[in-house]
């Protein structure tokens, strides 16, 4: 389950307490009698984030509280999360990262696009294509939007079939 081809999983957070907790908890996950089947989980310093083959962006600034009046949660998330992903994309550029930059945080597609665009701007904000290549940036959605659209289509199909 990864232990044979993944040497370790690195985690990083702005809080040392969070990373210590994650490292402790994740290293307790194992299969009975196959304790080395899963890769070790290690804390990685921010300056070492891109010394890897795959960087997975799963950070989030959060979601608006219920009743806040925010109509489009995805755009609220994008406004906040795009600033975070841009920072890491610029770091990937600076460090000449050659691996996969995977985006899992919502909204996946706009954040993946932001990562690619921001990595390809110089220090003056000029777009120069000297950052991540398009094929290096991949969005990995959790299927939530697809499922929501599927439910909506099913509901509409049911309504139209009732006539």
Report residues per predicted region.
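Short mixed-charge
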Residues: 32-42, 124-136
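Conserved S-adenosyl-L-methionine
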Residues: 2-8
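Rossmann-like NAD(P)-binding element
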Residues: 36-100
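Substrate/ligand-engaging "lid" and interaction regions
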Residues: 125-128, 136-163
């Amino acid at each position: 389950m990864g232990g044979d081809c993944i040497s370790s999983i690195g985690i990083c957070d702005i809080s040392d307490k969070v990373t210590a907790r994650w490292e402790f908890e994740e290293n307790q996950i194992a299969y009975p009698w196959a304790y080395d089947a899963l890769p070790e989980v290690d804390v990685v310093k921010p300056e070492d984030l891109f010394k890897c083959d795959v960087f997975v962006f799963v950070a989030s600034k959060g979601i608006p509280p219920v009743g806040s009046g925010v109509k489009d949660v995805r755009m609220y998330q994008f406004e906040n999360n795009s600033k975070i992903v841009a920072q890491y994309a610029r770091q990937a550029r600076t460090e000449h990262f050659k691996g996969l930059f995977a985006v899992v945080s919502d909204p996946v597609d706009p954040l993946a696009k932001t990562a690619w665009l921001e990595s390809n701007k110089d220090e003056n904000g000029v777009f120069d294509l000297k950052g991540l290549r398009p094929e290096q940036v991949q969005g990995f959605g959790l299927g939530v939007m697809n499922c929501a659209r599927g439910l909506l289509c099913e509901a509409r199909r049911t309504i139209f079939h009732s006539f």
